[in-house]
Amino acid sequence: MKKLLIVSVKAYQKYISPLSPPSCRYKPTCSAYMLTAIEKHGTKGILMGIARILRCHPFVAGGVDPVPEDFSLMRNKNTSKNAEKA
Protein backbone atom coordinates (compact mmCIF):
# COMPACT_ATOMS: atom_id res chain seq x y z
CA MET A 1 0.00 0.00 0.00
CA LYS A 2 2.83 2.38 0.92
CA LYS A 3 4.51 1.88 -2.48
CA LEU A 4 1.23 2.53 -4.31
CA LEU A 5 0.77 5.82 -2.42
CA ILE A 6 4.34 6.91 -3.19
CA VAL A 7 3.96 6.06 -6.90
CA SER A 8 0.68 8.01 -6.98
CA VAL A 9 2.25 11.14 -5.51
CA LYS A 10 5.28 10.90 -7.82
CA ALA A 11 2.95 10.53 -10.82
CA TYR A 12 1.10 13.66 -9.67
CA GLN A 13 4.42 15.53 -9.38
CA LYS A 14 5.58 14.44 -12.83
CA TYR A 15 2.40 14.64 -14.92
CA ILE A 16 -0.21 16.85 -13.22
CA SER A 17 1.66 19.44 -11.16
CA PRO A 18 3.62 20.90 -14.12
CA LEU A 19 0.32 21.83 -15.80
CA SER A 20 -0.37 24.60 -13.28
CA PRO A 21 1.81 27.40 -11.86
CA PRO A 22 3.46 26.81 -8.46
CA SER A 23 1.13 27.88 -5.66
CA CYS A 24 2.25 26.06 -2.51
CA ARG A 25 2.90 28.45 0.38
CA TYR A 26 5.11 26.02 2.28
CA LYS A 27 8.56 24.52 1.98
CA PRO A 28 8.76 21.64 1.25
CA THR A 29 5.87 21.71 -1.21
CA CYS A 30 2.68 19.90 -0.24
CA SER A 31 3.40 16.97 -2.56
CA ALA A 32 6.97 16.62 -1.25
CA TYR A 33 5.55 16.81 2.30
CA MET A 34 3.08 14.05 1.44
CA LEU A 35 5.89 11.83 0.10
CA THR A 36 8.02 12.31 3.20
CA ALA A 37 5.04 11.77 5.51
CA ILE A 38 4.18 8.49 3.76
CA GLU A 39 7.82 7.36 3.90
CA LYS A 40 8.10 8.18 7.63
CA HIS A 41 4.63 7.24 8.87
CA GLY A 42 3.29 4.76 6.32
CA THR A 43 -0.36 4.98 5.33
CA LYS A 44 -1.04 7.42 8.21
CA GLY A 45 1.20 9.83 6.29
CA ILE A 46 -1.60 10.32 3.77
CA LEU A 47 -3.68 11.91 6.55
CA MET A 48 -0.79 14.23 7.38
CA GLY A 49 -0.50 15.17 3.70
CA ILE A 50 -4.22 15.88 3.39
CA ALA A 51 -4.13 18.01 6.56
CA ARG A 52 -1.20 19.94 5.08
CA ILE A 53 -3.03 20.52 1.78
CA LEU A 54 -6.04 21.85 3.73
CA ARG A 55 -3.71 24.30 5.55
CA CYS A 56 -2.22 25.57 2.26
CA HIS A 57 -4.41 28.43 1.08
CA PRO A 58 -4.08 32.16 0.29
CA PHE A 59 -4.99 33.22 3.84
CA VAL A 60 -1.89 31.72 5.51
CA ALA A 61 1.65 33.08 5.39
CA GLY A 62 3.15 29.62 4.80
CA GLY A 63 6.76 29.02 5.73
CA VAL A 64 9.07 26.11 6.35
CA ASP A 65 7.01 23.20 7.68
CA PRO A 66 8.89 19.88 7.69
CA VAL A 67 7.21 16.56 8.46
CA PRO A 68 7.35 15.97 12.24
CA GLU A 69 9.06 12.85 13.59
CA ASP A 70 5.91 11.88 15.49
CA PHE A 71 2.54 11.48 13.78
CA SER A 72 0.48 14.67 14.06
CA LEU A 73 -2.21 16.36 11.98
CA MET A 74 -1.30 19.78 13.38
CA ARG A 75 1.21 22.22 11.94
CA ASN A 76 4.76 21.65 13.14
CA LYS A 77 5.47 23.89 16.17
CA ASN A 78 8.97 24.61 14.86
CA THR A 79 7.61 25.99 11.59
CA SER A 80 9.34 29.09 10.30
CA LYS A 81 6.88 31.80 9.31
CA ASN A 82 9.11 32.96 6.47
CA ALA A 83 9.29 30.63 3.45
CA GLU A 84 12.05 32.71 1.85
CA LYS A 85 14.53 31.61 4.53
CA ALA A 86 14.44 28.06 3.17
Swiss-Prot record:
Cell compartment(s), UniProt: Cell membrane
Source species, domain of life: Bacteria
Spans traversing the lipid bilayer: none
Entries under InterPro entries matching the protein: Membr_insert_effic_factor_YidD
Signal peptide coordinates: none
Pfam families: YidD
Topological relation to the membrane, as annotated: Peripheral membrane protein
Protein's UniProt keywords contain Membrane: yes
Keywords: Cell membrane, Membrane
GO cellular component terms, semicolon-separated: plasma membrane
Function, in words: Could be involved in insertion of integral membrane proteins into the membrane.
Family from the record: Belongs to the UPF0161 family.
Protein name: Putative membrane protein insertion efficiency factor
Species in which this protein is naturally found: Streptococcus pyogenes serotype M1
